[in-house]
UniProtKB/Swiss-Prot annotation:
This is Small heat shock protein ibp. CDD domains: ACD_IbpA-B_like. PROSITE patterns: SHSP (PS01031). Disulfide bonds: none annotated. Pfam families: HSP20. Keywords: Plasmid, Stress response. Residues 35-153 form the sHSP domain. Belongs to the small heat shock protein (HSP20) family. It comes from the Bacteria. The gene is ibp.
Amino acid sequence: MSYHSFSLEPKYENTMLSQRFKEIDKLFSTLSGKKIISDSVPPYDILQLKENFYKLIVSVPGYLEKNLEISTQYDQLIIIGKKEITENTNEKKETVEKILHQEIYTGDFSLSFRLNERISVMSATLDQGLLTIYFEYQIPEKQKIQKIQINVK
């Protein structure tokens, strides 16, 4: 299971240092023949729609609604994808002798996001290989800005 903290703070991962770690990870996976850890997790984006509304988009090409499960428990959002290898999606089955290059992940995956107690999951949609989950960040009345009218006498 891959665990991510869902925060409304921007996350800066595209730094020179993080790129170096990714390159080192790829180098060791090439030498050892083992799969890169980050390759078993589908890519995702977190976008702000309005002041208190957000959406999480997870790239899940080839997964059907029946292959995906979304749940919340305590302060976690859990997304599980299970894809049967023998599943025929109207494509002609071919025998593959050797995979020369593979970037499209097609196996099982699990993503977990820690949710702030004020974040509520509103809905989820699956459209053209993109799983979109909508969130609302609820601000308590006491913390909202209250404008006080000034009366002139």
